[in-house]
Amino acid sequence: MGDKKSPSRPKRQAKPSADNGFWDCSVCTFKNSAEAFKCSICDVRKGTSTRKPRINSQLVAQQVAQQYAAPPPAKKERRERTDRDLPDDDHFDMDNSDSDRLSSLHPDSDHPERLGLEGGQLDRGHSLKERRQERVLDKPQALDTDRRPERAGLTPDLLQQQQPQPQQHPQQPQQPQQHSQQQPQQHPPQQHNRIDREHTDRAMLEKLQPLREHMEKDHPHTAGSGMQPAERMGAEREELKKGKIERAMMEKHKERHKSLTPSKKPTPKKMKPKLIQKSPAGESNGMKPGKSVTKNNKSVISRPKLKNVDRSSAQQLAITVGNVTVIITDFKEKTRSSSTSSSTVTSSAGSEQQHLSSSSESTDKGSSRASTPRRDHSSGHNETL
């Protein structure tokens, strides 16, 4: 431990002393013998330099005198202090230091006391073990004595609830009497339990009989007398599974038919605006389909107003593509001048804009079915006015 040479600085060499190898402690300045590798007072190793302020030599002399008379109490405190201050390399077997030092100084004083202590401890250990064994042996006896008065003091009500226990404590004379009391008292509740079970079994069988008859009617091929109940249950389960699969297939077919034939009929509200009316009512009614188209388109494009359009020759076509219904209104050119020309101009312009926007939308979807009506129809409508 202490013989290692640190690479940073060379180890100090002790000064050669002319006193036959006696060396002074660097902490407490006590002159130690040549054989001692530690200071006999402060346990500092030989050759260490702790750079502490040295204690007065008078105090050291007093401590040495006290040490030979009686071991001083201050020695341990001083040793703890030096242990804290010393580096790790300088600690050497501190646990064995007391024994080494005391054996060197007082070879005969400490050992007999220790031997006496060890002998006393051994005797104590043996006595403790014996006491523990005695306690362990006494415990089951105490338990037996505790159990017996309780068993004697049992009431007949408790005895009815308990099961017969012939194995426990056969030595007692009271036990067979108690068992003889218990047995006649316990048989009636067992009989009652059996009767109750039989009643419940009968009730369950009565409930299950109509169900079984119903199942036999539904499944006559499984109700044969040769079939075991387990086989019947398996066959019924298979039939239930088949019925579920058939229902699922039917529902799928129905859904497919619905998806293949979507309803292309327009809604009656949008389909049936009144086509032919007098001029003031026609204007108000003609704007309604236009409003619905603007709601669907959500974008009104500003276009120049067309004044040469006849409002009364309105023809509407409804086209449904999926969920969207587009109403297209067709107008013919104006042939006669009416007194309500200004009002018809404004309404016809709005409806013409809607017609253009809706037709563009339908052509984008590739499903425009609007066909321009013939002149014959328009002339016929004009005649009805």
From Swiss-Prot:
GO terms under cellular component: cytoplasm; nucleus
Compositionally skewed regions (Basic and acidic residues) per UniProt: 74-85, 98-138, 193-221, 233-253, 362-385
InterPro entries in UniProt: RYBP/YAF2, YAF2_RYBP, Znf_RanBP2, Znf_RanBP2_sf
Disordered: region residues: 1-23, 63-317, 331-385
Keyword DNA-binding: yes
Highest taxon of the lineage: Eukaryota
Cell compartments where the protein resides: Nucleus; Cytoplasm
UniProt feature, compositional bias: Low complexity: 160-192, 337-361
Any one GO molecular function term: transcription coregulator activity
Keyword terms: Apoptosis, Cytoplasm, DNA-binding, Metal-binding, Nucleus, Repressor, Transcription, Transcription regulation, Zinc, Zinc-finger
Classification via Pfam families: YAF2_RYBP, Zn_ribbon_RanBP
Acidic residues bias spans: 86-97
Zinc finger (RanBP2-type): 19-48
Record's compositionally biased regions (Basic residues): 266-275
Biological process (GO), any one: positive regulation of DNA-templated transcription
Function description: May be implicated in the regulation of the transcription as a repressor of the transcriptional activity of E4TF1.
Name of the protein in question: RING1 and YY1-binding protein A
Organism expressing this protein natively: Danio rerio
Lineage: Eukaryota, Metazoa, Chordata, Craniata, Vertebrata
Gene name of the encoded protein: rybpa
